[in-house]
A protein has these predicted regions:
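Conserved short "hinge" loops at termini or chain/domain junctions
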Residues: 1-14, 28-230
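Catalytic-loop motifs flanking and including active-site residues across diverse enzymes
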Residues: 17
């Protein structure tokens, strides 16, 4: 499907609405399992489907909805008008504008519910990365690129991929019942070192206050210094 076709967006949206509506209505329906699938009881001689089968139906509807949500979120950035909406800003506020992060954690179900639960954790992790490594301005550039994939730079793409992998590891550490004492991946330092060596590719970082934290101190050998030498 062509993501630039708004009819595709409409199709994904309709799938989400239909699956969600059916899922929400299932508990209030008397369902039966017939040779042709599920049906509503309208005859006193027909035995309703078991709770287990009904729950399985609800789960399958939720999975269908989540697949449609993922497809929709992957397609929406191709619509210029959507990029200027509050909804876009919400999903673009982290490095994970789609449900990919749930897949990276090996979670198959429920994807959308898990994504919404993970967002506060992701936001806390990215705040730490902003203040200690990347800076707000450069993170905003990376987030926009994660959403739109508009950059032609292989280096930028590789940095974003590495940064997201670091975040996934940090999420795993936070979700672990026995988190590591020092869960910060060394890859973050490596990312900063690469950024330092390529000022033309990462202008926002080099123009930020965070860059000064990574500039080596130059010893000037002043007479007042204890280590002064002739």
């Amino acid at each position: 499907a062509n993501p630039h076709d708004t009819s595709v967006i409409k199709s994904f949206t309709c799938r989400i609405i239909t699956a969600e509506a059916f899922k929400n209505s299932c508990p209030s329906l008397d369902l039966i399992l017939t040779p042709n699938g599920f049906g509503i009881v309208n005859n006193s001689n027909v035995v309703p489907a078991s709770r287990e089968r009904v729950d399985k139906l609800i789960e399958s509807l939720e999975m269908e909805r989540d697949r449609a949500i993922h497809l929709l979120l992957s397609s929406l950035p191709s619509i210029p008008d959507w990029l200027n909406t509050a909804h876009c800003r919400r999903f673009a506020s982290t490095m994970f504008p789609t449900l990919d992060v749930v897949d990276s954690l090996g979670i198959n179900f429920p994807k959308w519910r898990k994504y919404t639960e993970l967002r506060p954790i992701i936001e806390d992790i990215e705040l730490m990365i902003e203040t200690q490594y990347i800076g707000h301005e450069q993170m905003e550039v990376f987030r926009h690129e994660a959403m739109t994939k508009s950059s032609s730079s292989t280096l930028v793409s590789n940095i974003i991929r590495s940064l997201k992998a670091c975040e996934v590891q940090l999420i795993k550490d936070k979700l672990s019942p026995d988190p590591a004492l020092l869960p910060i991946p060394s890859t973050l330092t490596n990312i900063v070192n690469i950024i330092r060596l390529h000022p033309s590719e990462f202008l926002e970082w080099h123009n930020s206050t965070i860059a000064s934290l990574y500039k080596p101190v130059i010893y000037e050998n002043k007479k007042g210094d204890k280590a002064y030498w002739f």
